[in-house]
């Protein structure tokens, strides 16, 4: 059930399976109802979107779902990729505003540094729907649609506590995103009740596999020996797994992620990865499309929408679509 709140070099052979999965992942890689263009029924609506990065196929799936609905109505979707650069994202938003978009769908690179662009959108009378995260000032947006990110961290921590009597844990974070912070916070808050679980290292992976692998390698080179790794998302988890396997430590280390990516589910099925708290980019995209048109048509809509998450483990992974997203 969706929760809502009302509101208007050479690679060693042993590492190749994980990196192959990683390569697949990378390759896939306020209601302003009086806005002038909305009243012009004979002209297509223009919806702008900008996600923190299109290097994560999670956002490509969301965008595809939006595009299916928007283009089926004869409207226009303009998608931009800031590539994890907040200044670039702010500039993209300014450009979209100059292109006379009617509404902006946003996944911010930095939930705080996005505010100047949000203020410009508000001044232009363009409503903003935030997806898969939050912003520091929710008064500047019409609606926020996100998975239960804090709950995703809780699920991973509870599984660790139910399967290991104690653990030394490494965290792979993405501090500039509210969603990433909430996942790690939910995980840490849950472990905090038991002194047998300790955080012994942490690094910022920016949610990217190609960053997570060397960051995890650095920690291991420093002599850190984790029993578990909590990653804010599946690309980071896959990067951590590659580093752990390079050091011959993967078999003894529990690895957790968040997303439910096909590659992660495959690794869980093979016993290489422990679990992932699964999101549904398909559902997120569908809900976003519904909300976009509710706002533009002056209909009632929910200001906050929280989409539940579930934990995928080796025990239940076969009940999920192994080749696609939820």
Feature roles, as predicted:
Residues 46-73, 78-95, 99-101, 107-111, ...:
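Extracytoplasmic "Venus flytrap"
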């Amino acid at each position: 059930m969706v929760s809502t709140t009302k509101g208007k070099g050479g690679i060693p052979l042993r590492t190749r399976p994980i990196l192959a999965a990683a390569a697949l992942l990378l390759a896939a890689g306020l209601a302003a109802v009086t806005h002038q263009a909305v009243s012009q029924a004979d002209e297509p609506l223009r919806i702008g979107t900008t996600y923190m990065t299109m290097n994560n196929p999670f956002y490509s799936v969301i965008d595809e779902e939006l595009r299916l609905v928007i283009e089926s109505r004869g409207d226009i979707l303009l998608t931009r990729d800031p590539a994890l650069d907040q200044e670039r994202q702010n500039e993209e938003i300014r450009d979209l505003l100059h292109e006379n978009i009617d509404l902006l769908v946003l996944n911010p690179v930095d939930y705080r540094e996005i505010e100047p662009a949000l203020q410009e959108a508000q001044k232009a009378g363009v409503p903003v729907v935030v997806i898969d995260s939050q912003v520091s000032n929710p008064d500047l947006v019409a609606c926020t649609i996100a998975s239960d990110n804090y709950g995703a961290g809780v699920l991973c921590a509870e599984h660790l506590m139910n399967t290991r009597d104690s653990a030394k844990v490494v965290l792979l974070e993405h501090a500039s995103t509210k969603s990433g912070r909430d996942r790690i916070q939910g995980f840490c808050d849950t472990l905090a009740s038991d002194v047998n679980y300790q955080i012994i290292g942490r690094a910022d992976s920016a949610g990217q596999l190609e960053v997570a692998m060397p960051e995890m390698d650095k920690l291991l080179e420093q002599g850190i020996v984790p029993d578990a790794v909590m990653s804010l998302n599946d690309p980071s988890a896959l990067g951590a797994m590659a580093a752990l396997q390079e050091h011959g430590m993967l078999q003894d280390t529990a690895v957790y992620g968040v997303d439910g990516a096909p590659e992660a589910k495959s690794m869980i099925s093979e016993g290489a990865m422990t679990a992932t708290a699964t999101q549904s980019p398909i559902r997120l995209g569908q809900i976003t499309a519904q909300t976009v048109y509710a706002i533009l048509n002056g209909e009632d809509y929910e200001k906050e929408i929280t989409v539940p998450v579930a934990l995928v483990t080796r025990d239940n992974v076969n009940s999920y679509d192994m080749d696609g997203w939820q």
